[in-house]
């Protein structure tokens, strides 16, 4: 690749003879620098992912699908693809990471909603990412959200969203992954335990295992027994935060209720069990100094590297 810098032109000529340059030489030098600027700009643009969005509808809910894809030509087998829940928040982080690291070559797909209203997004995600849940097992005491849309949401992603993405981008069907955080992490584990063949890699960040009386553990037990009978290569990254965020305004009773709801096995416990399975790669990382929210950009980066570069953060604690 051509590199036009002062060094390539010769330091002595660049600094020591500028005053005696002829008009022609000055013109040539200006052209060289102009070409160099164009080249640098072209390289930067080549590393900038192509970001787009389009809307879909399923089960009476409007969705916005956010996409970041490499600007370069796809390999013969197609690009890997990573589907991400909470797309409004996660896709911009993933797109930025792709722009900073050209090795992260994949199509990133964030499933989100066509609104910037945070309360509306919270309401919708509570429904899409959860099984039907009794009110007394929901940590919200007022304006209790509707739950139970998980199965329909998975079918929407697995059939409609995948089909649309594959019609727009060259995708490698053997390298598909799912990422989720919090309730999205719970959804990722649900997909793994109930629809394992839908993706080859999974990343669950601070998964809400405690949700609905820890019903996900029954799914896990069934998955483990079935997997032992028919093992196949599978990959999972689980990460967790180390700090609990403050919850001002809650009464002692509410805090006690919340603590009871969130007790029980953790993501680390699930990873410890799954890594014992044949052909199952399960990695884990705990961010001791990060909260549930502050870990997000860090865990997105870890997940992309785990899925695309086979870089495992296992046994690392921060």
Positions of PLM-derived features:
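Sec/Tat signal peptide C-region and signal peptidase I cleavage site
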Residues: 42-46
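Aromatic (phenylalanine/tyrosine) cluster motif
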Residues: 14-15, 33
């Amino acid at each position: 690749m051509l590199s036009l810098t002062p060094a390539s032109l010769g330091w002595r000529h660049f600094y020591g003879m500028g005053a005696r340059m002829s008009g022609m030489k000055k013109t040539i030098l200006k052209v060289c620098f102009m070409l160099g600027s164009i080249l640098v700009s072209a390289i930067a643009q080549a590393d900038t992912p192509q970001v787009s969005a389009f809307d879909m509808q399923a089960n009476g809910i409007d969705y916005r699908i956010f996409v970041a894809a490499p600007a370069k030509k796809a390999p013969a087998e197609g690009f890997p693809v990573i589907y991400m829940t909470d797309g409004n928040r996660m896709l911009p982080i993933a797109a930025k990471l792709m722009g900073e690291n050209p090795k992260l070559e994949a199509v990133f797909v964030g499933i989100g909603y066509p609104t910037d209203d945070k309360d509306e997004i919270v309401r919708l995600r509570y429904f899409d990412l959860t099984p039907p849940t009794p009110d007394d097992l929901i940590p919200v005491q007022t304006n209790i959200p509707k739950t139970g849309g998980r199965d329909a949401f998975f079918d929407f992603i697995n059939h409609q969203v995948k089909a649309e993405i594959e019609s727009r981008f060259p995708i490698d069907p053997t390298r598909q992954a799912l990422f989720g955080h919090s309730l999205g992490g719970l959804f990722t584990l649900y997909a793994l335990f109930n629809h394992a063949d839908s993706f080859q890699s999974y990343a669950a960040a601070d998964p809400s295992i405690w949700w609905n009386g820890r019903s996900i553990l029954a799914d896990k037990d069934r998955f483990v027994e079935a997997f032992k009978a028919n093992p196949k290569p599978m990959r999972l990254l689980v990460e967790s935060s180390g700090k609990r965020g403050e919850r001002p305004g809650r009464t002692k009773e509410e805090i006690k209720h919340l603590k009871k709801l969130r007790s029980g096995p953790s993501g680390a416990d699930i990873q410890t069990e799954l890594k014992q399975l044949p052909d199952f790669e399960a990695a884990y990382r705990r961010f001791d100094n990060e909260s549930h929210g502050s870990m997000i950009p860090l865990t997105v980066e870890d997940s992309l590297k785990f899925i695309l570069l086979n870089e495992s953060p296992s046994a690392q604690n921060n």
